[in-house]
């Protein structure tokens, strides 16, 4: 199946969106720590399927400080356990957080570390809200794209301003 790629310029830097003709398969910040990150943001592929435009609208709403309503169709690839964890992340509403331990209990797993690994493997950052998962005792915890990006995403949702 053909892969489509587009780049979104966010207040936090470029975001690369990848899809097939029906669903988003990957969404990542260009500052990703992994070695497979392009040195510069790729140019938007033309033509792109409607799912790309839907995702760009979702991102526009998000970075405008609005709670995005319509989640684009997603097709993340992962293990059954990872997919269970990623599905649980959708229960964390915009402007809220949960701990790795809370997510572990939700998916019936005894290990918050295993949940942390699944959260870290999320291929569709931001839309699958892994940035809303924090460490115990309110610590911000890690993030595949760095804690500064995670902190800024939480600020977009006014989460950090409400915490003591």
Question: How would you label these PLM feature ranges?
Answer:
Residues 132-136:
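Short, basic, alpha-helical segments at the C-terminal edge of helix-turn-helix-like DNA-binding modules
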Residues 118:
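Residues in the recognition helix of alpha-helical DNA-binding motifs
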Residues 1-110, 156, 160-164:
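Basic nucleic-acid-binding alpha-helical/helix-turn surface characteristic of O6-alkylguanine DNA
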Residues 137-164:
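…primarily DNA-binding HTH/wHTH and HhH modules…
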Residues 127:
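Major-groove DNA-recognition helix of helix-turn-helix-type DNA-binding domains
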């Amino acid at each position: 199946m053909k892969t489509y790629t587009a780049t979104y310029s966010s207040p936090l830097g470029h975001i690369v969106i990848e899809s097939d003709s029906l669903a988003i398969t990957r969404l990542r910040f260009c500052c990703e720590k992994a070695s497979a990150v392009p040195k510069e943001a790729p140019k938007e592929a033309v033509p792109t399927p409607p799912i790309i435009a839907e995702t760009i609208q979702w991102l526009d709403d998000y970075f405008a400080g609005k709670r995005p309503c319509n989640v684009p169709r997603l097709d993340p690839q992962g293990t059954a356990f990872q997919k269970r964890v990623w599905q649980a992340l959708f229960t964390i509403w915009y402007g809220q957080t949960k701990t790795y331990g809370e997510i572990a209990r939700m998916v019936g797993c005894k290990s918050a570390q295993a949940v942390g690994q699944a959260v870290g493997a999320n291929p569709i950052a931001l839309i699958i809200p892994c940035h809303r998962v924090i460490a115990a005792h309110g610590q911000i915890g890690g993030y595949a794209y760095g804690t500064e990006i995670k902190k800024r995403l939480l600020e977009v949702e006014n989460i950090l301003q409400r915490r003591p």
